[in-house]
């Protein structure tokens, strides 16, 4: 049951395509001799695994003295950088952002939520770090071991890694070809069932490009989905073709 649920999105798309082909065949049977066309939709689908990982995290320091806060942040930055290098991350894969500074206050409010008084309590300094690498498994493992840094005193906030595919353009072209071939086969079958032959291609239209997690119940989007939270993904695309019939 779980497997059926996981594939429900793809099933819905496939059923819709089959139904549209059925309608196309029936529409052709009742065709107007001055406008003999048939419309079909083909599907291209492929499972693939991400080859690029992006891991974002941040660390903070607080102090009533800005210079002290900077010094503490610098110490943590060096500790984090050395930790990543010791785990085999390349220096060029590590990017630190500029430092963000905010002033902190303790405030009291009146009954109308207007500030009655405020007392300065210090500065909060925050810096982001991003690791981008094609060594997906290595960075995954490092992201799960950040408690080592936290235990050493680095106040690190780790985000979930994001996963990408660097050959997406090539994959999309392959899938368009697959979806076009599928649509043409459906058109030929529909024409054959109606006792006719397929003519020239009149019009083609590409549907939205969907990337979702493999074996998931993730929803399809009319505007297109682009999953970045899963390493293993499934890509889908549709092609709508209109053929002349003779």
Predicted features and spans:
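Short, charge-dense linear interaction motifs
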Residues: 1-95, 99-246
């Amino acid at each position: 049951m779980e497997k059926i649920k996981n594939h429900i999105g793809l099933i819905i798309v496939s059923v819709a395509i089959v139904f549209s082909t059925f309608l196309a065949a029936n529409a052709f049977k009742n065709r107007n001799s001055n406008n003999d066309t048939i419309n079909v939709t083909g599907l291209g689908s492929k499972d693939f695994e991400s080859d690029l990982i992006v891991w974002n995290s941040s660390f903070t320091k607080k102090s009533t003295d800005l210079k002290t806060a900077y010094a503490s942040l610098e110490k943590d930055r060096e500790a984090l950088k050395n930790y990543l290098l010791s785990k085999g991350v390349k220096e060029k894969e590590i990017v630190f952002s500029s430092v963000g500074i905010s002033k902190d206050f303790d405030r009291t409010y009146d009954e109308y939520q207007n500030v009655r008084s405020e007392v300065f309590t210090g500065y909060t300094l925050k810096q982001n770090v991003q690791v981008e690498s094609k060594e997906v498994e290595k960075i995954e493992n490092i992201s799960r071991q950040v408690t080592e840094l936290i235990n050493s005193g680095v106040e690190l906030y780790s985000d979930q890694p994001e996963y990408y595919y660097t050959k997406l353009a090539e994959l999309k072209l392959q899938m368009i070809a697959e979806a076009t071939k599928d649509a043409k086969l459906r058109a030929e079958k529909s024409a054959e069932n109606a006792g006719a032959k397929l003519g020239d291609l009149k019009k083609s239209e590409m549907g939205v490009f969907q990337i979702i997690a493999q074996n998931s119940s993730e929803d399809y989007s009319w505007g297109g989905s682009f999953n970045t939270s899963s390493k293993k993904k499934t890509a889908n695309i549709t092609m709508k073709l209109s053929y002349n019939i003779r």
